[in-house]
Amino acid sequence: MEVILLEKIGKIGNLGEVVKVRSGYGRNFLIPQGKALPATSENKSVFEAQRADYEARQAEILADAETLAAKVDEVSVVMKRPAGAMDKLFGSVTSADIAVFYKDLGLNIPRNIIDVLTPIRTLGEHQVRVRLHPDVVRVISIQVERAVK
């Protein structure tokens, strides 16, 4: 299935490109999410007529992502968790926990854009990737400390 991308999508293509994707991915994800249009001649002409609007919207989204990235860089993430004698956590720190941490600070970062590179199951410093936009990716440090009982 060929689609016209309405925004930049990592590993697939940029705004306005006609790319070939799996039919299910196009029908079930890209098109319903408003990220693509089926590549028909009618849709191509509609896209070209509205191309400037799409580009302006993408520039605005990129600017918002860069602003959010600056705020993410300012915050030091410290998570307090109960741990055993060998500094192993009872459970783990997940992307949902990190999203809740940011939400408590007033930053809207959904858990699906937070990539925990390695499972966080011990005390100490860990690296996590936050994909705010295909062009704006930050690697942040998370400090996990023992919770005081």
Curated annotation (Swiss-Prot):
Keywords: Ribonucleoprotein, Ribosomal protein, RNA-binding, rRNA-binding. One of its GO terms (cellular component) is ribonucleoprotein complex. GO terms for molecular function: rRNA binding; structural constituent of ribosome. InterPro entries: Ribosomal_bL9 (IPR000244), Ribosomal_bL9/RNase_H1_N (IPR009027), Ribosomal_bL9_bac/chp (IPR020594), Ribosomal_bL9_C (IPR020069), Ribosomal_bL9_C_sf (IPR036791), Ribosomal_bL9_N (IPR020070), Ribosomal_bL9_N_sf (IPR036935). Pfam families: Ribosomal_L9_C, Ribosomal_L9_N. PROSITE patterns: RIBOSOMAL_L9 (PS00651). GO terms for biological process: translation. Belongs to the bacterial ribosomal protein bL9 family. Binds to the 23S rRNA. This is Large ribosomal subunit protein bL9. The gene is rplI.
